[in-house]
Amino acid sequence: LSFEDIKKNIPKRRENSHKGDHGKLLIIAGDEGFGGAGIMSSESGLKTGAGLVKLLTRQSHVSASLARNPEVMVSGVDNAQDIETNLDWPDAVVAGPGMFQNYWSEQILYKLLVHVADNNIPTLLDAGALRLLSHKAFSKIKLHNETVLTPHPGEAAEMLNIAVNEIQKDRIKSAKSG
């Protein structure tokens, strides 16, 4: 695909449209020490056309996120209950950048995945969220059809329980096998 191919498929915005007309993206990212993952993810949401972007991250990353991107709504979350009031807000969700295999990430991701599956909210799972999916606690969660997984070869190998070099031999075949 060329840039021109992509550009011609991006819908033009009406002159009288406003941010509320262009979708609400919820991002859950950035465990302790990895606030940049949330910052970069929220910037990407803005740059790719989301009208409203809300970032849920560790409390310690809120100030840096707001300083860098004041147009992003940022909230610090300490546990899964802290995300509940935000779950009905988005049109789409991104989760995983800067998340790890720890209690904070596990409880938040679990609550999120149950909600998006029950409500068919389009969801992109990346990085730490993908690694957590292989945990036994997540085995009963069914991802809905509007879930996109974006693993790099190491994450794909872990998810498929095969060696990275097997992924690298034929990425397309590996993706289809999962």
What residue ranges belong to the model's regions?
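YjeF_N-associated NAD(P)HX repair module
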Residues: 1-28, 32, 153, 173
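Substrate-binding N-lobe of the ribokinase-like
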Residues: 17-79
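Membrane-targeting and insertion segments and their boundary/processing signals
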Residues: 8-19, 36-39, 127-130, 145
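Short low-complexity stretches enriched in small and charged residues
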Residues: 6-11, 28-31, 47-55, 102-110
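Glycine-rich phosphate/dinucleotide-binding loop and adjoining beta-alpha-beta core of small-molecule
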Residues: 1, 55-178
